Amino acid sequence: MAEIYDFDKSAWDVKGSIQPIGPKTYSDGRLIPQVRVIDPGLGVRKDECFSYIFLWGLSEDSDPLSPPIGRTFGSLPLGVGRSTARPEELLKEATILDILVRRTAGFNEQLVFYDNSPLKVLTPWKKVLTSGSVFNANQVCETVNLIPLDFYQRFRVVYMSITRLSDNGGYDIPRHWPEFRSMNAIAFNSLVTIRFEQSPIEHWRILNSEHLLVATFMVHIGNFQRKKTDMYSADYCKPKIEKMGLVFALGGIGGTSLHIRATGKMSKTLWALEGFKKHLCYPLMDINEDLNRELWRSKCKIVRIQAVLQPSVPQDFRVYRDVIIEDDQGLFKIL
C-alpha cells in the first residue's frame, strides 16, 4: 500500500499556474494570432535567456485556387533557441511560415513537418523547421484521422507559447531512470492535481470536494534504498523529502510541463540518480499526451501536490511496451 502526504501550498504558490490564450477573432471569424510567455524559473541565468518555443495552429488544405479548409488543430514543438527578438517579432514570423504537413506511419502514426520559407528571427530554431521533423501524431495532433492524404496540408500558426529557461544550469528530463527498480526500495512519486478554467473533454470531468474541474497525473522522482536488506519506512522517508525543499512550477515544454527544483539537501544516491542536477522537467507530452492536448492553450493551476511513497516494483516483474505478450509458442515475432 502507498503512504501519501501533502506538500505545503507554498511549494507551488508562486509559479504553479499558466494563463490561458483566449480566442480572439477578426471580423471574418479567423483567429487572431497571440503569444504567451511563461517563466517557471528563478530568472538567475546570467547570459541571454534561452527560450523553448511551442506552436499551436490549424492543419488546412493548401490549395491556392480555393479558400483553405481547416481539418484539425495541432502543434509543432520547435525546441530551444537563443534570441534577443521580442515575442511579438517571433510570433509575426511564425504566422507567415510556409509549413507543410504530411501524414505517414512508422511504429505509430506520424506527422511530418517541413518549412519552405526563409527564416530571420526564428533562425535559432531552424533545426526543426528547415531540416524537417517527424513527431508521434497522437502527441502533436488533436484528431489525426481528419488529415487527408489526397490534399497538401499546410500548418497555419495561430498561437505561440514561449517558455523562458531562466534557471542556472541544465534541466534533467527523466526518461530512463524512472524505470529503475530495486529490491527493498521505496519509490518516491508525486501526484499532481490541477484545476482547469476551460472545460476539457468529457472523460476528464472529475469534480473535487469543492465542485471544481480537476485532473491528476503522477511523476516518479526517485527511490530510497538502504544498503542492508531491510526497507526504509515511510516515516523515515518523509523528513528526507522535507529536507529536499522541493519547489514546483508549470511551464510550456511540449505543451505543458511540470518543473521541480530542489532547494535543500538531497540524498547522495538520489542526487547521483538524477545526474547531479537539481532541476527536473516533466513534459506532459511524454507522461499523459491526452491531458496535454487539452491544456495546449487553457488556463490551469496546481491545487494540490502529494508525495506518494510506494514499494518499488520488484525487478522480476517484466515491463511490456506493447500488447504483444511474448509466448512460448513463438507465434508473434517483434521485427
From Swiss-Prot:
Annotated compartments: Virion
A single GO cellular-component term on record: viral envelope
Molecular function per GO: structural constituent of virion
Domain of life: Viruses
Any GO BP annotation: virion assembly
Family matches, as Gene3D superfamilies: Viral matrix protein, C-terminal domain, Viral matrix protein, N-terminal domain
Main location: virion
Keyword flag Transcription regulation: no
Presence of the UniProt keyword Glycoprotein in the record: no
Coiled coil region boundaries: none
Keyword field: Viral envelope protein, Viral matrix protein, Virion
Sequence similarity: Belongs to the morbillivirus/respirovirus/rubulavirus M protein family.
Role summary: The M protein has a crucial role in virus assembly and interacts with the RNP complex as well as with the viral membrane.
Protein name: Matrix protein
Lineage: Viruses, Riboviria, Orthornavirae, Negarnaviricota, Haploviricotina
Gene (UniProt): M
